[in-house]
A protein has these predicted regions:
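Short, structured surface patches at the beginning of a domain
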Residues: 1-99
């Protein structure tokens, strides 16, 4: 089974959500992930949704789709990849933590 990517699009930040979704799926496929998407009705923060989905990575169309505090929370549980510009953020490593 392939690792899981949690696709996230902030619809307030996106000017073309369908295009962004296609780009997230394309990057996930290229990196070898299967994509799961959030429940549209969920009010949970992105980090909690990604944790519930057991995601290995959260893929965003661009860095501005997550604020800095939420990015920090997401990086506690998953890597973060962005489509454009192409960035990779590794999850925080906790010294002595067993995962």
């Amino acid at each position: 089974m392939r690792p899981t990517a949690f696709g996230w699009i902030d619809h307030d930040a996106s000017t073309a959500p369908e295009w962004d979704r296609a780009q997230v799926c394309r990057l996930a496929r290229r990196l070898g992930y299967r994509v799961v998407w959030p429940d549209e009705r969920s009010v949970l923060p992105v980090a909690d949704q990604a944790r519930d989905a057991e995601a290995d990575v959260v893929i965003l169309p661009a860095p501005h789709h997550l604020g800095p505090l939420e990015l920090n929370r997401v990086m506690d549980i998953a890597d973060v990849e962005t489509v454009l510009p192409r960035f990779s953020f590794a999850r925080w490593h906790r010294a002595g933590a067993v995962r």
